[in-house]
Amino acid sequence: MPPIYDLFAMIALGFCAALGMGALVSPKWAAGVVRLVADPDPDKPGGFSEFRATYGGLLLLIHLSALIILLQDGLALPYKVIALFPIAMGWLGAGMGRLLSLVLDRAENRANGLIPVWIPMELILGFAILAPAFGLGASLE
């Protein structure tokens, strides 16, 4: 059984990859999750392509590739952490940006909506993906 730190990362990476798969298969679903309109300007179509590409393919493959790297038994933990670090920082940055928006963009946001839900979710995902790094010191002894 993998260490508990790895399990946290595996669950978070699998969850994020599943979100990406959902967006890839159903861009309407992705539009509802992120509360954006696919084509707000009829003169500039292509919104569904963006949902499939950015929220779908990118999210799916970046998390799936990190999960595959994490599952490599022969690969030393520091190398796995190098693969996980930028993805974790992306989620932590998303949470930080959303927190700033909650504080600074009150008028533009009109209502908090799901912002207070997404902030802890993004922070949890970031720390969960980075969790194997917390066991790094023990593995080097």
Predicted feature locations:
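Core segments of alpha-helical transmembrane spans in multipass integral membrane proteins
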Residues: 47-71, 89-93
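Transmembrane helix-loop-helix
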Residues: 69-106, 110-116
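Juxtamembrane boundary at the C-terminal end of a transmembrane helix
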Residues: 129-141
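Small-residue-rich segments of transmembrane alpha-helices in multi-pass membrane proteins
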Residues: 50, 113-129
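Alpha-helical transmembrane segments of multi-pass membrane proteins
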Residues: 16-22, 62, 90-94, 118
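Cytosolic, membrane-interface loops and tails of multi-pass inner-membrane proteins
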Residues: 26-48, 101, 105
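N-terminal signal-anchor transmembrane alpha helix
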Residues: 6-25
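Membrane-interfacial loop-to-transmembrane-helix junctions in polytopic alpha-helical membrane proteins
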Residues: 1-7, 44-50, 54, 75-82, ...
